[in-house]
Design a protein with these regions (language model features):
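Ferredoxin-reductase
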Residues: 1-78
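Structural signal for conserved beta-strand scaffold positions within catalytic alpha/beta enzyme cores
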Residues: 6, 51, 154-156, 209, ...
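A generic structural signal for residues embedded in beta-strands
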Residues: 36, 84-85, 227
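Short, Lys/Arg- and Gly-enriched loop/turn segments at beta-strand edges
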Residues: 42-51, 89-99, 237
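FNR/FR-type flavoprotein reductase catalytic core
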Residues: 71-216
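Local cysteine-cluster metal-coordination motifs and their immediate loop/turn environment
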Residues: 112, 190, 213-242, 270-275
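Short Fe-S-cluster ligation motifs
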Residues: 235-239, 243-280
Length: 280
């Protein structure tokens, strides 16, 4: 059992939790993930390590409420326990040797991008961060990114905060200003990553993306997280989650990601209705 030490609501649909998990924290690195079960009968869901504190023995997770399991997780409070918390899993993000990097995060993907930007900053790299959201109410981790970035661009679709536009608009602007990046790291919605990669390919900039498809066992056995990368089948849980963005078949990944969306929406609505009845 893993105790929740801190809970913070970042926006109406995104929550941060610090979880007591010393063995996981001891080995965690940016880019890796954990798989948890809220209770004994719960489903297994993957969540990327948003931060870690080896001395305190804690792992920070940030999740968006999108289905019944994340709804159930969000109902837990400080002092409550998560039944299973397995990790760290996956291959950590490559950060060594990079001198100038653009880190691009979209929505809740910023939770994955932040620890990478933080490590790059700590290694002495020049970090240009671009974070994008639909509107000001959905902005998360702005202060955290500001503390580890030499340049920070905040974009919103409607212009209610930061600059109006897409993350690709900001990235193109920085490239056209003459910034030569060793690498671009893009993490967020599949469509966003697809178009970031399309842009960087035109300029010949190496680009890494973090792929977070459906996962079940986290060992590559189930095949649920399979992707096509460079014409070959890869598994996000053991081969990733980071991949060369110019080799990822995004159209296939987008199609696969929508397979269970209707079912997830239905379960989310059922859970919400059940919770309302319990309250009543």
């Amino acid at each position: 059992m893993y105790k929740i030490l801190r809970k913070k609501v970042l926006n109406p649909t995104v929550t941060l939790m610090d979880v007591e998990a010393p063995l996981v924290a001891k080995k965690a690195e940016p880019g890796q993930f954990i798989i948890l079960r809220v209770d004994e009968n719960g489903e297994r869901i993957p969540l990327t390590v948003a931060d870690f504190d080896r001395e305190a023995g804690t792992i920070t997770i940030i999740f968006q409420i999108v289905g019944s399991t994340t709804e159930k997780l969000n109902r837990l409070e400080e002092g409550d326990y998560i039944h299973d918390f397995v990790g760290p899993l996956g291959v950590s993000s490559h950060t060594e040797g990079l001198k100038k990097v653009a880190v691009v995060g979209g929505g809740v993907g910023c939770a994955i991008a932040y620890p990478i930007a933080k490590k790059l900053h700590n290694l002495g790299a020049e970090v240009h961060s671009i974070i994008g959201f639909r509107n000001k109410d959905l902005v998360i981790l702005e202060d955290e990114f500001n503390s580890v970035s030499d340049v920070l661009e905040v974009m919103t679709d409607d212009g209610s905060h930061g600059t109006k536009g897409l993350v690709t608009n900001a990235l193109l602007g920085l490239i056209e200003e003459g910034h030569n990046y060793d690498e671009v790291i893009a993490i967020g919605p599949l469509v966003m990553m697809k178009f970031v990669c399309k842009l960087t390919k035109e300029y010949g900039i190496p680009t890494v993306v973090s792929m977070n498809p459906i996962m079940i066992d986290g060992t590559g056995m189930c095949g649920g997280c399979r992707l096509t990368v460079g014409g070959q089948t890869k598994f996000a849980c053991v081969d990733g989650p980071d991949f060369d963005g110019h080799l990822v078949d995004f159209d296939e990944a987008i199609e696969r990601s929508s397979m269970y969306r209707g079912f997830e929406r239905q379960k989310h609505e059922e859970t919400c209705n059940l919770f309302k009845k319990e309250v009543e």
